[in-house]
Design a protein with these regions (language model features):
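Terminal targeting signals and extreme-terminal segments of soluble enzymes
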Residues: 1-132
Length: 132
């Protein structure tokens, strides 16, 4: 993501997965996804990579919303804890910046399922690059 570019976090992969931006600003972002059959693993549960992608997208957008014009950010690492299985319905990721230096941002995303059940918590470190 680069300031002045798309910045919505809804890149090609996010669109392919059906991830939708809901809100973004002031170091926060919310993205949603409707679970589809092709999101399920062979056990009938949403694949962890889908939940991870939703959290990553929300965290990147949250940090992007706090960047200066011309800056960009990219994921360095993410740790995710899966707390409950999801088999259908809606998923929502709410992300926020919890720490920042000149070159890195630390973010948290909480992913909720239908009824507000917490299904995953992720923390991520992102690299911040200045305009060239």
């Amino acid at each position: 993501m680069t300031a002045g570019g798309s910045g919505t976090g809804a890149g090609a992969l996010a669109r392919l997965l059906g991830i939708r931006p809901v809100s973004m600003g002031d170091g926060r972002a919310r993205f949603e996804l409707t679970v589809r059959e092709d999101h399920l693993n062979p056990n009938g549960v949403v694949h962890g990579g889908i939940v991870y992608s939703l959290a990553d997208t929300a965290m990147g957008a949250a940090l992007f919303s706090a960047l200066e014009p011309g800056q960009s950010c990219t994921t360095l690492e993410i740790k995710i804890n899966y707390l409950a299985p999801v088999t259908s319905g809606e998923l929502a990721a709410e992300a926020s910046v919890i720490g920042r230096t000149k070159r890195t941002g630390v973010l948290e995303a909480r992913v909720h399922g239908d009824g507000g059940a917490l299904v995953a918590v992720a923390t991520g470190t992102f690299y911040i690059q200045s305009a060239r």
